[in-house]
Regions:
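Short, basic and Ser/Thr-rich N-terminal targeting/leader segments
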Residues: 39-41, 46, 61, 87-90, ...
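A generic local secondary-structure boundary/capping motif
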Residues: 35-37, 56, 79-86, 92, ...
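N-terminal non-catalytic cap/leader segment that marks the start of a structured domain
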Residues: 1-65, 70-71, 77, 171
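Catalytic-pocket segment enriched in acidic/His residues
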Residues: 16-20, 26-28, 123-241
Length: 241
């Protein structure tokens, strides 16, 4: 990691020391376009599907599920590659600040705004429907193309993540039109439950022609890996009537 990487900084200093250093430092103005990725991050992540009830209703899926998101994040203003049926999904990316082995590790997560882009045509052709299999086929390929994980420039590390999330609202706008809006509190699986399910997962997921685990080391969410929250209603795709 770079010397100014915030995750490396938090590994060396506690939150109080970081706040004290920030308060003592002079203010600096930085143009928005100069801001890049907020930290050095990995390329093997865990994502939640239909974790907002209204989004599950609009796509015809009843329960949340998990799947691997095997792609490196890109800058917030990066061009997204063209796809047959490209779709957006505004999400919260929970960032592991250190290796996490239990749901109590939810306190070791930061948060970044991200977009879980999808090739819906590739997804629909490859997915399996039904309890226990949702997410195991189609999702990793349809959401794992290079450039399909643009990320905001700000890493937020709350003192109390779960309390902080009660005040967060997700919005996505397209060409001046509001498409998605929901409070983070609408998540069906809260972050602690998502984390527990990911750490306990033993399923095989199809990606790039091979079976892969949800986590590269089962039972461990490694430092710099992401846990994606799922998205609110308002995506382009709709289930047929």
């Amino acid at each position: 990691p770079q010397a100014d990487d915030p995750i490396a900084l938090l590994d060396r200093m506690d939150a109080a020391a970081v706040r004290a250093a920030a308060a003592a430092a002079p203010s600096v103005r930085v143009p928005l376009e100069a801001l890049g990725l907020p930290a050095d991050l990995g390329a093997a992540h865990v994502a939640g599907g239909t974790n907002f009830r209204a989004h599950g209703d609009e796509v015809g899926v009843d329960e949340p599920f998990l799947f691997p998101k095997r792609v490196a994040p890109t800058r917030w203003e990066s061009t997204v590659p063209a796809a047959t049926r490209l779709d957006y999904e505004a999400e919260l990316c929970f960032v592991a600040l250190r290796p996490i082995r239990g749901s109590e590790g939810a306190g070791d997560l930061g948060v970044v705004l991200c977009n879980d882009f999808t090739d819906r045509w590739l997804l629909v052709r490859g997915m399996l429907l039904g309890p226990g299999v949702m997410g195991t086929r189609g999702f990793a390929d349809a959401k794992g193309r290079p450039g399909f994980l643009p990320m905001g420039p700000f890493l937020v590390v709350p003192d109390d993540l779960e309390r902080w999330l009660q005040s967060v609202e997700l919005e996505l706008w397209v060409n001046g039109a509001l498409r998605q809006r929901a409070p983070a509190s609408d998540m069906i699986w809260a972050v602690r439950e998502m984390l527990a399910r990911a750490l306990a997962d033993r399923e095989a997921y199809r990606y790039a022609g091979a079976d892969v685990p949800l986590l590269q080391e089962r039972g461990v969410l490694p430092a710099r890996a992401l846990l994606l929250s799922g998205t609110p209603a308002g995506v382009i795709f709709r289930a047929p009537n």
